[in-house]
């Protein structure tokens, strides 16, 4: 059966169509996972259609990725819908629960007011009744149980106990003011059901009295309020919705990460493989059978899909699950093999046992049959045959009877043992009470009864309850009668009706008297429990102990009350109760202090161990980081040297190639078709290397900081150890004070005893009473002082513990910070490794490029040397594998023409010589046209001067506005200090922007210098007009690029303004959060102030008590008044104690409120996570907007293409104008002036951007002022919260207004275009300039052709070529500088994007709060109007430079791509951080699993020990079986000997028969006639004998089966018998001494109220546990040591 249970496990249920990941052996060597669609499955095998890895074309893979992105977006939409519905449900559930709580609270408050209005006299009348009504008793019990949160009150308290509780002053007020919601009453349903019955309903309560009716209503309303309040935290629907929200967020996050990876792979355009980011699969029709145990997991893929894509995260999860399943399968297989081996061993033993039994059965059968046939062969022995058949039947039937009897005996023994099973459980059944007696022999029972009556009573009740299998309260009316020889006990037993009195008597007689015998033996041991309490009370009140010997505690209290020690019974009882309460409080406080110290010490040790482990791990990691940094530095140095060696060679080769290509292009030759070399990367690589070195230095500084933090942690640990030693010393002081208190009490007892002996007369008795009263007062004062000292010590200890807890929390926070720093350093190292890999790849590429250049260079030298007409190169050729110095390459001539091209060039030069005359004439015409263009350009210059004057006026107006704004900034300087952190970030952005602007200015200066050089060259070389036109075109391009940069800066300024506004919003939201936190802190401070006030009140009360004590000492003569005042003061002390309890309850409430606040903070954190998810949605929308912008850029490019077509048409028309060549110089000068004007405009745009930034700063300051005003006006904040919905509507209206403003802006643009005075002239001039530029470009193209022909014909080609080469080199330098500037701009853009990402996060939170400030909205509208004016002016200026805007859009698209790449990098970093967190969580889980495994190993060790014990028992049983088999063999031999004796007897009898026959020969003749009859009878007898033998054989076969079944039944019964004997309750203490060993055990009890038992009834709990543990282990109770109780809540 064990093997069957192991094999038959629940298989995994799969549905057809599901996509699963499963394991299979690839090539029979190693495991590999694959995807498959389930076709069918049974209990052990699953048939799947396998998915193959997609290795098709890139287009197919891109299609798969795009379809997967669409699927994930759909899933994200489904998750979003589920999230919104879950949020709505959660809000509805919470509102429903809160409404229920508010309604129940209102009813409860009404009931409390109704109870408070009841007269106290009326309540005393109710409690003074001797026989109250059942409804009154039940209601008062319910109120008491509910106020004390003790359900035992309703079952165990009597009417006298209830009266005592309600007699206390202000008892009703205390009960109704109890914390109902603090603790949940466990048996609320019982009270509700009982109070809703007809005889205990509200009608019955109202008929009884008004007080009972109000209390009845209070109980029901309190239970309803408690239930509604518990629903707030225990409502499972809330947790379900929270789980649904968490699942939706996790699903959205997973979808988003997968979409990001898919988009990244789609943009990269590579082929996804197993080693990359993605893995693509395609569904095939190949079916495969796989075992069901090889299924790893179910993959979330649409069954209808034909292809799918998995990310590396999903693949990693599948691989982890595959490893887990393989480990589980191996474990299961080993378990199966062990079970199989056990089953095979058991089967082998059974087969051997059955074969042996079969051999024995065959031997017995053969002997039996042989004896039958031998006896049947003899003649004239019918009697003998009958005897043998009878004996055979008896021998056959004997085993059956013996085994049946054995089974019956075993069943009877088992039945008897099961009736004495110690694992009995009491069931609630109808009961009956019977009278019983029991006697115990012994001569010292009278001594036991006299010395330990309470212990004797509890021991007897426990023992008899265990004997009768009933609870202890079922043993009643116990009477002890002790004689000189025995103890006679009579008692009543309440037992179930199905048990008779005879059965109970039998149980009582059979049960061993273990506890009673121990009491008789330990009669001289010290007293304990209530017996000790009687002695302590007698000593405290100076009573004679011998007067109360043999009395129980209840009788003792009655006798003491009858003595009339203090005139009033109630006062005396209250004094005794006060003393007992004081003692109990002292012990409880000491115990609680001990417990807290132990817990704090354990916690401190645990924290210290964890910190040491973390410090050790940090040290190891620091060492690794140092080694890694050293290695990286070495690599950086090597790469730097290598880069320096190869940079010069590579740059020279590139320069030669570019120069050759330019010269070839100028001469209409095709460019080289060799592989393009990479861009100059060595400069960028050095910068990156410098950055990495700076990162290494930062890592070193972080390591030093971590070392300092570790040292600080060690110092904090030493401080904590010192504090712990101080707390332990305080604990020892408290214990010493407790001992001193006990010694003083004993001294007072001795003094009172001595004073009693000297008194004889009544007057002396009065004096003795006065002395006793004074002694009691002194004791009370001392006790009060000691209690105050204990409380102060407890407060100080608690303060130390709280301080230590705070330090531990600080240590945890520091450790978390160090872990974060460590994670950051690891991330930096990973980035360094990636960068190092990139450098290696670049190095390999550069080396391959150098090899290709060297090989080309060597081939060119070889080919040149073979040509006789060309001059050979003087340098020696080297193998292309060797390095060539830069000087050698620079000294060589530039090779840019092939031989064929050179020959063609010579042939064409002859042709061009013939056409030279014609071209000269055309040049003359071009000069004439140029003069005309010069005149027109002068007119345009005058018009441009007028426009510049207008711009100058506008600039002056802007300056005046700046002065006005500066005045506003001076007024807001006092607010600038509060926003330094936010403005610092913006200032950094501004500085970076200024850097970019300074770079642009430098470029402008360089452009001016180039333009001046071009003018000089144009003046010197009139013949090179065509080249000047080319340069002018290049200058125009540069100007356009400058304008693009300016527009880019303007866009950046606008984005900065938006970010500033978003920062302001986020600042507002942060300040609101800070205000809420300040409110919470103020509430906490108020609560702390209330606690301090309570402490001060307690101190005042203590001072009042001292004053009262002094007054009592002065009025010692007035005994009666002193007694009354003592009673009053005792009542006041009780009130104070109750007030202390109430304050403690209030403190508990405050702690619970703090926990609720913490839960609310957690909810806020969850809401923040949701906000982050919404922000991610907005980021996706921004990406969509970026895509739209890209589309717009494409449309602009189309427009540019159309413009180019128009330009071509204009060029055709300009070909007819021959005079354009003359106007070229004038146009160049005008273009220079235009470039200068553009630079001025760029400067003006920069100023405008700065003004916009100032505006943003002003807006921030205004926002901060508004936030301060909001913080100062809390009432306004509440109203603003109420008007949040209205503000949201206003925000929507504002958005509509913004849209309208945008429309107005568009209209203004149209109107600005219509303004003829300001804009038409400028636009016309710009259009004319553009047309002229296009015409110039057409002429430049024609002139280029002419210049090329002239260069071929003119002898001055060499000079021109050299000048052109110099210009090309300068242009290349400029291009390189521009590339460097572009790289710097990209870096600045990346930094701006990082800042923008941070600002976006802040902005998304601030946008929600932006609508709350109406004044700010109005001011923002005013500012928006001003900005719109500025925007209009900027648009007018932007309209002048359309081409620059187009290039700006292209740059913006590139920047957006870079921003997306940055976002992807940030997402990857976040993924790495999350993976690190997951790894940390997995490590913690592994640690927990290791602990669980250790616990399981311990359990397995215990099970192995049990198995060993069972094996020993089985060995003993086998020995018993062997002994039984031997006994059976002996019985068989005895029976065989008996058969032989019977054979001898029969032979003797035959002889006698022969003698009789000889004597009776005379009668033979008479018998001869009967011979024939006898012969026939003999034949018939033989036939019957044969039939009987056959029947016996069949019976033997049947008996063998029954014997085997009976033997198995006997074996099972014997096992059951052994088990029941082990758990039999009739065990006795061992009489002989044996070796003992002490072991530690743990037992867990389920339940919610164990903490209350531990605190309220520790002694009862200890005694009950010791009794149960002793009975379970079959040892006396005094052998149960070191019992400690630990509540499950304290473990966590």
From Swiss-Prot:
Q: Where is this region: 37 X 14 AA tandem repeats of E-E-L-E-L-K-[VA]-A-E-N-E-K-L-A?
A: 1012-1529
A Pfam family per the record:
FAZ1_cons
Tell where it localizes. Answer: Cell projection, Cilium, Flagellum
Q: What happens when the gene is disrupted?
A: Assembly of a compromised FAZ and defects in flagellum attachment and cytokinesis in procyclic trypanosomes resulting in generation of 0N1K cells (zoids) and multinucleated cells, demonstrates the role of an attached flagellum in cellular morphogenesis.
Q: What is its main location?
A: other
Q: Which UniProt keywords apply?
A: Cell projection, Cilium, Coiled coil, Flagellum, Repeat
Q: Which GO terms describe its biological process?
A: cilium assembly; mitotic cytokinesis
InterPro entries from the xrefs? FAZ1_C (IPR056615), FAZ1_cons (IPR056614)
Record's keyword annotation contains Coiled coil:
yes
Start and end residues of the sequence repeats are 1012-1025, 1026-1039, 1040-1053, 1054-1067, 1068-1081, 1082-1095, 1096-1109, 1110-1123, 1124-1137, 1138-1151, 1152-1165, 1166-1179, 1180-1193, 1194-1207, 1208-1221, 1222-1235, 1236-1249, 1250-1263, 1264-1277, 1278-1291, 1292-1305, 1306-1319, 1320-1333, 1334-1347, 1348-1361, 1362-1375, 1376-1389, 1390-1403, 1404-1417, 1418-1431, 1432-1445, 1446-1459, 1460-1473, 1474-1487, 1488-1501, 1502-1515, 1516-1529
Q: Name one GO cellular component term.
A: motile cilium
Q: Which residues cross the membrane?
A: none
Give coiled-coil spans as residue ranges: 613-657, 684-864, 903-1607
Please give the function described in this protein's UniProt entry: A component of FAZ filament that is required for correct FAZ assembly and attachment. Not essential for new flagellum growth.
Write down the PANTHER family for this protein, in alphabetical order.
Answer: CILIA AND FLAGELLA-ASSOCIATED PROTEIN 58-RELATED (PTHR32083), TRANS-GOLGI NETWORK-LOCALIZED SYP41-INTERACTING PROTEIN 1 (PTHR32083:SF48)
Which protein, by its recorded name, is this?
Flagellar attachment zone protein 1
UniProt organism field: Trypanosoma brucei brucei (strain 927/4 GUTat10.1)
């Amino acid at each position: 059966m064990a093997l069957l249970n192991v094999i038959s496990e629940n298989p995994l249920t799969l549905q057809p169509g599901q996509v699963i990941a499963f394991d299979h052996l690839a090539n029979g060597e190693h495991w590999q996972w694959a995807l498959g669609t389930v076709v069918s499955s049974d209990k052990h095998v699953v048939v799947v259609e396998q998915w193959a890895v997609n290795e098709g074309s890139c287009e197919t893979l891109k299609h798969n990725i795009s379809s997967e992105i669409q699927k994930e977006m759909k899933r994200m939409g489904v998750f979003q819908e589920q999230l919104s519905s879950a949020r709505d449900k959660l809000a509805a559930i919470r509102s429903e629960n809160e409404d229920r709580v508010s309604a129940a609270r209102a009813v409860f408050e009404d009931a409390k007011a109704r109870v408070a209005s009841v007269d106290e006299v009326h309540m005393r009348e109710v409690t003074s009744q001797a026989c109250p009504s059942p409804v009154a008793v039940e209601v008062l019990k319910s109120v008491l149980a509910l106020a004390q949160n003790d359900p035992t009150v309703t079952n165990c308290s009597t009417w006298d106990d209830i009266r005592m509780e309600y007699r206390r002053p202000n008892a009703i007020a205390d009960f109704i003011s109890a914390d109902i919601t603090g603790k949940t009453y466990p048996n609320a349903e019982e009270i509700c059901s009982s109070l809703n019955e007809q005889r205990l309903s509200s009608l019955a309560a109202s008929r009884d009295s008004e007080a009972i009716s109000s209390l009845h209503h209070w109980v029901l309303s309190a239970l309803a309020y408690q239930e509604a309040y518990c629903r707030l935290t225990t409502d499972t629907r809330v947790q379900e919705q929270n789980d649904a929200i968490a699942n939706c967020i996790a699903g959205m996050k997973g979808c988003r990460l997968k979409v990001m990876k898919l988009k990244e792979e789609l943009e990269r355009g590579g082929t996804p493989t197993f080693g990359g980011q993605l893995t693509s699969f395609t569904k095939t029709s190949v079916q495969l059978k796989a075992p069901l145990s090889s299924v790893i997991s179910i993959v979330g893929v649409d069954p209808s899909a034909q292809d799918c894509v998995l990310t590396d995260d999903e693949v990693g999860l599948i691989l982890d699950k595959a490893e887990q399943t393989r480990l589980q399968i191996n474990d299961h297989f080993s378990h199966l093999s062990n079970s199989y081996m056990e089953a095979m061993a058991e089967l082998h033993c059974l087969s051997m046992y059955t074969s042996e039994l079969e051999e024995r059965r065959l031997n017995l059968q053969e002997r039996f049959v042989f004896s039958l046939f031998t006896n049947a062969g003899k003649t004239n022995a019918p009697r003998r045959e009958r005897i043998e058949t009878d004996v055979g039947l008896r021998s056959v039937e004997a085993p059956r009877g013996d085994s049946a009897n054995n089974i019956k005996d075993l069943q009877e023994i088992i039945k008897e043992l099961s009736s004495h099973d110690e694992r009995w459980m009491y069931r609630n059944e109808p009961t009956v009470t019977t009278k019983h007696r029991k006697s115990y022999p012994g001569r010292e029972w009278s001594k036991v009864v006299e010395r330990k009556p309470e212990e004797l009573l509890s021991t007897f009740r426990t023992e008899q309850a265990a004997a009768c299998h009933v609870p202890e309260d079922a043993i009643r009316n116990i009477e002890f009668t002790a004689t000189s020889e025995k103890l006679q006990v009579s008692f009543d037993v309440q037992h179930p009706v199905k048990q008779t009195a005879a059965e109970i008597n039998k149980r009582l007689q059979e049960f061993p008297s273990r506890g009673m015998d121990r009491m008789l033996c330990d009669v001289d041991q010290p007293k304990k429990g209530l017996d000790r309490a009687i002695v302590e009370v007698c000593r405290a009140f100076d009573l004679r102990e011998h007067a109360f010997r043999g009395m129980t505690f209840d009788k003792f209290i009655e006798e003491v009350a009858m003595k009339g020690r203090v005139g009033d019974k109630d006062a005396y009882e209250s004094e005794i109760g006060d003393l007992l309460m004081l003692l109990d409080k002292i012990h409880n406080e000491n115990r609680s202090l001990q417990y807290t110290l132990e817990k704090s010490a354990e916690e401190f040790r645990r924290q210290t161990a964890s910190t040491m482990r973390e410090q050790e791990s940090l040290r190891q990691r620091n060492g690794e980081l140092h080694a890694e940094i050293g290695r990286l530095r070495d690599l950086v140095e090597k790469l730097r040297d290598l880069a320096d060696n190869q940079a010069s060679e590579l740059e020279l080769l590139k320069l030669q190639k570019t120069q050759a290509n330019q010269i070839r292009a100028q001469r209409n030759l095709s460019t080289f078709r060799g592989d393009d070399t990479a861009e100059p990367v060595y400069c960028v690589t050095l910068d990156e290397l410098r950055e990495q070195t700076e990162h290494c230095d930062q890592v070193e500084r972080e390591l030093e900081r971590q070392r300092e933090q570790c040292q600080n942690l060690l110092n904090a640990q030493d401080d904590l150890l010192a504090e712990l030693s101080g707390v332990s010393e305080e604990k020892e002081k408290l214990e010493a004070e407790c001992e001193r208190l006990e010694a003083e009490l004993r001294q007072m007892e001795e003094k009172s005893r001595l004073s009693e002996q000297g008194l004889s007369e009544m007057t002396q008795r009065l004096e003795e009473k006065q002395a006793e009263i004074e002694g009691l007062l002194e004791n009370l004062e001392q006790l009060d002082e000691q209690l105050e000292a204990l409380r102060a010590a407890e407060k100080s200890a608690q303060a130390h513990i709280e301080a230590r807890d705070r330090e531990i929390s600080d240590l945890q926070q520091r450790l978390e910070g160090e872990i974060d720093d460590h994670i950051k350093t690891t991330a930096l190292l990973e980035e360094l490794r990636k960068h190092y890999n990139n450098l290696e790849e670049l190095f390999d590429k550069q080396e391959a490029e150098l090899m290709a250049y060297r090989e080309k260079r060597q081939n060119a030298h070889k080919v040149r040397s073979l040509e006789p007409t060309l001059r050979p190169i003087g340098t020696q050729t080297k193998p292309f594998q060797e390095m060539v110095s830069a000087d050698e390459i620079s000294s060589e001539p530039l090779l840019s023409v092939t031989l064929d091209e050179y020959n063609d060039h010579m042939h064409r030069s002859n042709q061009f010589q013939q056409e030279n005359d014609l071209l000269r004439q055309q040049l003359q015409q071009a000069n004439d046209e140029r003069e005309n263009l010069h005149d027109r350009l002068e007119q345009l210059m005058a018009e441009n001067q007028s426009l510049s004057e207008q711009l100058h006026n506008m600039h002056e107006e802007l300056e005046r506005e700046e002065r006005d704004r500066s005045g506003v900034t001076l007024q807001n300087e006092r607010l600038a200090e509060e926003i330094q952190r936010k403005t610092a970030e913006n200032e950094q952005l501004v500085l970076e922007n200024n850097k970019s602007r300074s770079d642009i200015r430098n470029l402008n200066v360089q452009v001016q210098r180039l333009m001046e050089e071009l003018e000089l060259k144009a003046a010197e070389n009139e013949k090179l007009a065509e080249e000047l036109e080319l340069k002018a075109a290049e200058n125009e391009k540069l100007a356009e690029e400058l304008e693009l940069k300016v527009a880019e800066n303007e866009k950046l300024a606008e984005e900065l303004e938006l970010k500033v506004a978003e920062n302001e919003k986020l600042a507002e939201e942060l300040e609101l959060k800070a205000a809420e936190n300040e409110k919470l802190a103020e509430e906490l401070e108020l609560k702390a102030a209330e606690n301090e006030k309570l402490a001060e009140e307690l101190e005042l009360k203590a001072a009042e008590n001292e004053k009262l004590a002094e007054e009592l000492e002065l009025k010692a003569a007035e005994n009666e008044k002193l007694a009354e005042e003592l009673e009053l003061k005792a009542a006041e002390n009780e009130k104070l104690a109750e007030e202390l309890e109430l304050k403690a309850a209030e403190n508990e409430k405050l702690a619970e409120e703090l926990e609720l606040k913490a839960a609310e903070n957690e909810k806020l954190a969850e809401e923040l996570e949701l906000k982050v998810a919404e922000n991610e949605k907005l980021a996706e929308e921004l990406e969509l907007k970026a895509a739209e912008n890209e589309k717009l850029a494409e449309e602009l490019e189309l427009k540019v293409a159309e413009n180019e077509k128009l330009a071509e048409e204009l060029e055709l028309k300009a070909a007819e104008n021959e005079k354009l060549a003359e106007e070229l110089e004038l146009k160049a000068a005008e273009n220079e002036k235009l470039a200068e004007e553009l630079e001025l405009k760029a400067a003006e745009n920069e100023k405008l951007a700065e003004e916009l930034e100032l505006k943003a700063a002003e807006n921030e300051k205004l926002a901060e002022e508004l936030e301060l005003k909001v913080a100062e006006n809390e009432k306004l904040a509440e109203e603003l919260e109420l008007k949040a919905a209205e503000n949201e509507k206003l925000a929507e209206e504002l958005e509509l207004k913004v849209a309208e403003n945008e429309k107005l802006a568009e209209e203004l643009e149209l109107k600005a275009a219509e303004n003829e005075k300001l804009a038409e002239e400028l636009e016309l001039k710009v259009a004319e300039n553009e047309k002229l530029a296009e015409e110039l470009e057409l002429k430049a193209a024609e002139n280029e052709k002419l210049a090329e022909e002239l260069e071929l014909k003119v002898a001055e080609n060499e000079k021109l070529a050299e000048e052109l080469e110099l210009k090309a080199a300068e242009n290349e330098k400029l291009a390189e500088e521009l590339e460097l500037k572009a790289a710097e701009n990209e870096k600045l853009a990346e930094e701006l994007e990082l800042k923008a990402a941070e600002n976006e996060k802040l902005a998304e939170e601030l946008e929600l709060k932006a609508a709350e400030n109406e004044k700010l909205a109005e001011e923002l509208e005013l500012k928006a109007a001003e900005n719109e004016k500025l925007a209009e002016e900027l648009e007018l200026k932007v309209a002048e430079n359309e081409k620059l805007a187009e290039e700006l859009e292209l740059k913006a698209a590139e920047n957006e791509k870079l921003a997306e790449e940055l976002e992807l990098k940030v997402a990857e970093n976040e993924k790495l951080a999350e993976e690190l967190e997951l790894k940390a969580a997995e490590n913690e889980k592994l640690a927990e699993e290791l602990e669980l495994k250790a616990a399981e190993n311990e359990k397995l060790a215990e099970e192995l020990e049990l198995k060993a014990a069972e094996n020993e028992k089985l060995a003993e049983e086998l020995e018993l079986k062997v002994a039984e088999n031997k006994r059976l063999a002996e019985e068989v031999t005895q029976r065989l000997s008996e058969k032989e004796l019977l054979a001898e007897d029969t032979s003797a009898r035959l002889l006698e028969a022969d003698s009789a026959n000889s004597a009776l020969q005379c009668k033979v003749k008479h018998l001869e006639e009967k011979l024939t009859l006898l012969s026939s009878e003999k034949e018939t007898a033989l036939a019957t004998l044969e039939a009987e033998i056959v029947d016996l054989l069949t019976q033997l076969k049947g008996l063998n089966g029954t014997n085997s079944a009976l033997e198995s039944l006997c074996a099972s019964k014997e096992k059951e018998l052994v088990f029941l004997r082990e758990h039999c309750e009739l065990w006795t203490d061992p009489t002989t001494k044996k070796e003992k060993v002490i072991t530690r055990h743990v037992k867990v009890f389920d339940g919610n109220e164990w903490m209350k038992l531990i605190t309220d009834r520790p002694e009862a709990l200890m005694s009950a546990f010791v009794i149960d543990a002793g009975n379970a282990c079959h040892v006396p109770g005094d052998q149960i040591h070191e019992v400690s109780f630990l509540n499950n809540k304290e473990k966590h």
